[in-house]
Every structure is written in structure tokens, then in C-alpha cells.
Amino acid sequence: MAIKKKKKETKSKDNNNDNLRNEKKSTNLENGKYDKKKVEIYEHGIGGITQNKNDNNKENAYDDDIYHDKSEHINVKYLNEKDYEIEKVSKRIYEENSKIKKISLHHKILKEELETKQLIEQNDKKKKNSLDYYKKVIIKLKNNINNMEEYTNNITNDINVLKAHIDDERNERIIYNNNMKILINEYNSLKKNIQDLNMQEKEQHKFNTKLKEELKELYKEKENMEKKHREDFKKLQQKIKEQKILSYENKINDLTKEKDKNKMENGEANKYEDKHNNNNIHNNNNIHNDNNICNDNNICNDNTIHNDNNICNDNNICNDNNICNDNNICNDNNIRNNNIISSNNKIHEKDNMINILNYYEDEKKKQLQNKIVMLKKLCLRILFINEYQIYNIKKLQENINNMNNAINSINLISYKKGDFDHIIINLNVSKEKNYSLISRINLLNYETNVLKQLIKKMKEKFKHLNLQNDEIINLKYDISNNMNEKMKHIKTSLLTNQETCNLKKKCFDDCLLYLKQLYTFIKNYENNNDKLNIKSQIINKDKNLHFNYIHKYNEDILVDENYINDFLIYIEKYIYSLNFYLPTQNFNYKKYLLHNGSIHNITLDTHASSKEYLQKEDSSEFNQHGHNLLRDSLNLNEQQENKDHLQHEEHTHEEEPKDANGDMVNIEDANGDMVNIEDANGDMVNIKDANGDMVNIKDTRGDIENIEDKSGDMENMKEPNGDMENMKEPNDDIQILKEPNDDIQILKEPNDDIQILKEPNDDIQILKEPNDDIQILKEPNDDIQILKEPNDDIQILKDPNDDIQILKEPNDDISTINNLTTHLSNENNLMTDLPKVDHKIKDEIQSEHILESTNISDDNINKENSLEIPLNYDHTQENILKNKNNMEDQNNLLEQNIMTDQLQNHKECEEFKPHDNKEKNNIINDDTKNLISDDTKNIISDDTKNIISNDTKKILSDDTKNIISDDTKNIINDDTKNISNDDIKNISNDDIKNIGNDNNKPYNEDHNIVTINDEKANYILNHFNSRNIEYDKLKEEIPNELLNIKYDSSKKSTISTN
């Protein structure tokens, strides 16, 4: 502002100076400042310009006067111009001086401003070095980071929404394509039927044309017959006429002879009369007969004049007689001819009728023969349909096996971080095969409908037949009965076939179980998270969208068994809704619970407090994370059936070979394979058959016979009642924990405690069945022998055949992992068992009761079992979670898992020590240190090195490096850096060094790791809950076309995916 004011002042001064100079100029001109003398002096000073001009022009005085006047006038103007130019130059100089002054002023002002800025900067530097300034900057940065996070969250939510809609569109396209395939098949079948109908119409048309031609021929024959009749009638008439003429001639000849006799007597009399009579005779003969005329002429010529009168008289008489006779004869002949014609017509009509009847009978016979041939063809076709149906039943079995595979893929829902795309791939495969199944059933139904129509047509045709014929009636009844029997057989085979019904029930029950598990998980997850309500996040709440499929069924999912196709669509949409609304890939709730040490390390002092803890935590803390997965999923009837089945199988396995102490007996078969048969407490029987295949039979709680061939396929053996108990029966443990009365019984009865503690371990150690080292962890007697009898331990670990055979079966581990999903749903049960473990470690009295109930002599043995069995469980699950993303390469990590299990057992023993009393610490330290220092170090140092060096170095050379690198990346991304790094270091480093390092770690480091992971997991939960806040913003940004999509299972018939 100061600079602008100074500029204005300088401008005003310049204007004032210009005004003054113009005023001076005007005053000088008015006063006549430029005189002649001054002009002359000025001219001399310039150079005498005017004098030279005057000298040249002195001759004419008059002219001189005139010139002087002009020169004076011109010189004044010139001087004024020069003066004006001088003033202009002076103005310019003044203006330049003023500009220089302005520039100097600007320089001064800039110097002042620079000084002030330097002072301000110095003050700012002092302030920036202060803490308050840094705090403000940090707050601003945090706000910016939060804004960026909100922005990225909005973008990710938009992307997730769009992904879901893209997946839905993809599914709709798949459904559309599948429907188009079905429609094309139906269209082709309709085309074929139409072609068949056209062929039949053409045949009928040909047959009709033939009939028309035959009718035309018949009409022609009729006409020909009529013509023949007419011709015959004419011929008969002519013959009759000829006969009459002959008879007349004979009579005339007789009469002529008589006349000749009379003429001889009366020859000469009455000549005139004779002449006149002769003329009359000639006329009469001309009228009646031409032949008579000729004869009369001859007679007239022969007769004499004398006999003319007699002759004339005779002729008159004869003529009269002849006329009478002719009339009579003609009448008789007419009557006779009419009678003959009528009789002939009747005869011909009878012949025609006979011919027509014969023709129709021939046609009826031909039609009957054609019908019999058609019926024979139909019977053959029905037989073919029955054979085709047997083939279709085999196809049904294959398709339902594919359905079972799809159901097993549904088991992996909780296994791959919430991604469900791989399940939908398997579902789509099973659906396509199910479509082929349904199309075959539709073909059978179509054929049955065709048969029905044919039966109706046959009945209609039989109505027109002659019912008096017994053969036709018998044929009709036989054929109709056979057709009805075949129809009934087809219907019953389609609807009431036990094989297909059982297979359908398998698929249906399995799907129901898994969907119930999913439903209960989501329901608990929603109800126990107040901030996170998945129902409120459904886009376009009023219309049918994802979760309408879930919540409309509630706990009892009501789907008809016959509509498997719609049921598959329901499963697919259910999984997609889970994939969209469940936590993102960064948050894995199972890992969060497993690695959250604050939950695992809870200890309780008294028996009563443990009850209260179980009841509280069962309802509050564990429910917050959605781990009461299978609360009300089973009925009491199913539990009772399971218990009966368990008792039956426990009696069957009591007859298995045992030694005196009830330990496991190793039996070698003829091929040298090991047959490991465990006691009733171990609940595991591993048998190798002659082919080297593993047969895993689980007894008390599993009720599964997992028969694994070399290809790694699973066969779930079923009870005869048709219900799948594989997935239902492991849930008994959960319901035992659910009811408070059962909890009290569990805590009071030590025998039940052992079973409950052991069974979860058995469920998860199915994954590691091929490893003898993990089986050692399960079997109580063998655990003690390892820890106290070094010679036996060395013999067990030095059996190279078992380990080598285990490592050489690649598909066993993968196929056993498929069993994981049947048991991972029991996590809540296992989590609630962990505080019991702590309680059991503390109570020596209960451990003594346990020893008495199991009939084992050594007290220290069961102390080690009570420590090791539950502790090993948690880390086997951790190893399972580490190897999730590398399903195919798990065989390469078997040895690593064995070693990490052995190391982590010691680590967890130390984790539980700070919570125990001093006496118990002394007992555990005395027992475990001696055992570990004397026995297990020797075993690990000598035997496992040899096994790993000889057998598994080749396997673990290249693959494990890649696997470890992949595991580290994946686990670091999943917010479990500290735990994963420790585990990976344990895998990659030497095993003996790890024992020392893990035992020397203090408890505080592990506790710090746990708290850091708690904060990270809570941050991820809060991040997930923030989606509810941003939902309104998302709803405004998403286009309406995506929001208004409806999902109806009736319109759509199916899945796919990456």
C-alpha cells in the first residue's frame, strides 16, 4: 500500500510541473518576448544566415523592405519551433528524472519489506523449533492421512460393490448360457418331433393319395361295368329279335305251302280281287316285314291268275294272325327282357358288394398287422427306456459325487481368508452336470408322455375295431396292460428309486448342514457386533437382494429335495453375499483368535470361577468375534442317534489287539506295511492295506471312514438310514458346552474331561495323520515312553520306512485337509476348552482322578499328557494356517511342521509357568527339564538330523524356499508380522539352535507381541466397522442401475468365477 501511495504522489508532482511550464510559455508569447535585436543577435550567433540572405538582395530597395519584413516573420516562427523542441527535450529529461526517483523509492520500500520478512522468518524459525508447532503439524498430517484413508475406503467400497455386481452379472450370464443350452436342447428335440410329425403327415398324405387313386379306379370299374351291362343288354335284345324273325319265317313258309295247295284249287276265281288283294298284301308286307314283301312278290309271280282270290283270302287271314302273334310276341319279349335286365343288375350289384367287402377286409387286416408291428416296436422301445434309465442312474451317481465334491468345496469357506470363488467354480461344475441330470430326467418324462399319448391313440383306434373278434380284444387288453405296467415301472423308478433318493438326500443334507453353519456364523456375527450390522449394509433394503436368501429361511432352511437346481443357485448367491459382506482379506478372524495370546493365556484359580468364566465367555467375549458357529444347528434326535452309534462302535473296537497296558500294538502284515491300531482313548486306527493305501478310521466322535486311495479321493461312508452323520456328529462337543448342566457334569467327571480334551486334538490332527511324530503327541502311553525311555524313542524314530512312506504319498495330506472344514467350525468349543487346560494344570487332585480312571500306573505320565495334549492343539492349528495358501506343497512342509511342533511345545510350557503356583512350578520344572535335557535332545540331535538329511533334503531343497518366501509375504500382509517371523525363523534355521533360543526367551516379549497384535486386529475391526459410516456416501455415488437389481431364484438357474 505504501508503494502505491508514493507512486500517486510522484504522478501528481509531474502534472503540476507541466502546468507551470505551459503557463510560462503562454505569457512569453503575449508579452512579445522575441524582439528584432534579439533575433539579429541570435542570427549572428547561429552563423549569419539572415545577413547572407540580405546581402544577395540589395539592388532593389523596395524589394529589400519587403524581404526584411518577410524574414522577420519567418525567423520568429522558426525560433518558436526550436523553443518548442527544447521544451519537449526538457520534459523528457524531467520525466526520466521522475522515473529514476520512483525506482529509488521502490528500492527503499523493497528493502524495508525484506527486512520485515527476515524478522518474521527468524521468529517463525524459533516457533518451528518449539513442540507446539510440531504437535500442530502432526495433527494436520493425521487429519490429512485420515482424509486419505476415508477416500481410499470409499474407493475400496465402491470397488467391492462393483465387484459384487460384476460377479452377479457374470453369474447371470452363466445362468443365461446354461438356460440357453437347455432351450437349445429343447428346441432341437422339438425340431426332431416336428420333423417326425411332418414325416408322419407325409406318410398319411401318401396313404390318402393312394386311397383316392383306389377310389378313382373303383369308380372307373363301376363305369366300365355299367357300360358292359348296357352292351350286354343291347346284344340280348338283338338276339331276341333275330330269334323272333326266324320263328316268323318258319311260320310263313308253312303258310305258303298251305296257300299253294289252296291256290291250285281256287286259281282262276276272283282275279280282280286277287289284284286288289295283291296290292294290299304288298302294302302290308312293306309295313310289317321286308322279307314278307319279297316273298309275296315271288308268290305273285309264281301264282296263276286262278289262284289269286284264294291267295288273297289266305293272305288276309294270315296277315291278321301274324299281326296278333307279333303283338303277343313283342309283349312277351319285353317282359322277359325287363326281367333279365333286373336280374342281371342284381347279380352285378352283389358281385360289387362282395368285391368291396373283400377289399375292406383286406384293408382291416393290413391295418391290424401295422398296429401289431407298432405295438411290438413300442414294447421294444419301453425295454430300451428301462435300460437307458439304468444308464441314467449311473450318471446320477456320478453327478451326485460331483455334488459331494462341490459340498466339500463349501467346507473350505473358512479356510481361505473369506474368498469363496474357488467354491463357486466347483459348484458350477456340479451344476452343469446336474443340468445334464435334469435334462435326462426330462427326456424320460418326455418319453413317458409320448407313451401316454400313444396309449390314448391306441385306445381311440381300438374303439373303431370290430369287438366281436376275440383275437383283437385279447390283443388290445394285453398291449394296454403291458403299456400301463411299463409306465408304472418308469414312474416308480424315477420317483421311488432308493439309490437316487439316497444320493439326493446325501447332497441335500450336506448342503443344509453347511448352510446352517454359515447362517449361524453370520447371525452371531451380526447380533454380537453392535456397530457392524450387516443387514443395515444391504443396498436397497426394501427389495430382494443378497441377505434375503439368508434371513427368510431363519434357522430352518426350507428347501424341497426335488429342486436341487434352485438350491444350488441359493448356495451360490449365499456365498457371494458372504464374500461381499464378511470382513475383507486383511482381517482373518480365525488367525486373530489363534494368535491373540490374551485369550489363550487366561488363568483361573478356583473350580467355581472356571464355571463362571465358561458361562460368561461363552456368551460374551467369544461371541463378539462370531465364533459360536454351530449353536442351534442340530436336534436332540440327531444327538441320540449319534450316541447310539458311538456306543455300537466302541464295542466293536474293544476287540482290537492290545498289550497288557492297553498300549498301541504295531502289527506288520505280509507286505511289511505297518498297521497302527490304537487304544480306545486315542480314537484313531491307521491301517495300511496291501496296496500301501492308508485307511483312516475314526471311532468315538467322528463316525467317519475316510478311505483314501492313491489319487487322494475321499469316500464318506454313510449309515444305512441315509443321513450323513459325518458333519453332524462332531458337533456334540459344542452342545455339551452349550448347556450349563452339561458344563457342570464336564467339570465334575474327570473321565469326560479327558475325552473332551482329547477329541478336539484328534479332530485337527487328522491333518497330520501320516506323521508318526504327531501320532506320538496323541497317544498318551507313547508320549511317556518318548520322554522317559530313550531306547524305545530311538527305535521309534529310527524306523525309516514309516517316514519315507509318509513323505512319498503326496495326495494323502491334501485329501486329509479336506477333513479340516468339518472340524474348524468347532473353534469356539476349542477356545472355551483352553481355560480348562489351565485349570487342569493347576489341580493335581483332578489329575490323580484322571490317572485312576485311565488305569495307568505312572503319575508323572498323566501330568505330561495333561500339559502336552491340549497345548499341541493350538500350534497344530497355527501350522495349518501357515500352510493354507500352499495346499499343493504341504508334503514338502511335513518335516518342518514336525520340528516346529516339538519346539513350540517347550515354548508354551514356559508361557503357562508364570501363572502357576510355586509348588507346581517346581514340579513341572523338575519333570520337564530332566526329561527334555536327557531324552528329547538326544532324540532330536541324533535321529531327526539323519532322517532329514537322508530323506527330506532332496524334497526341501527348492520348494521350501519358495514356500517360506510366499508364507512370509502372505503372513506379513495379514497383520501377524511378529508371530509369523518367529515361526518362519524356526522353520528356516537349524532345529537345535531354535530349542535353545526359544527356551531362553522371556515371557514379556511374547506378551508384548500379543498386545501389538491386539491393537492391529482392533484397528482392522474398526476399519471394517467404518464401512457402516461411509455407507451413505457410497449410496449416493453408486448408480441407480446397479442398486435396482433384483435376485429371484425362480427366474435364474445358475455360478463362476475367477
UniProtKB/Swiss-Prot annotation:
Q: Which residues form the signal peptide?
A: none
Q: Where is the composition biased (Basic and acidic residues)?
A: 11-34, 641-661
* Highest taxon in the source lineage: Eukaryota
- List, as start-end ranges, the regions of compositional bias called Basic residues: 1-10
**Keyword tags:** Coiled coil, Merozoite, Repeat
Coiled coil, from the record = 515-544, 872-905
Q: Where is this region: Disordered?
A: 1-34, 641-665, 706-728
**Applications (biotechnology):** Possible candidate for an effective malaria vaccine as determined by epitope response in sera.
Q: What is this protein called?
A: Leucine-rich repeat and coiled-coil domain-containing protein PF3D7_0703800
- Source species: Plasmodium falciparum (isolate 3D7)
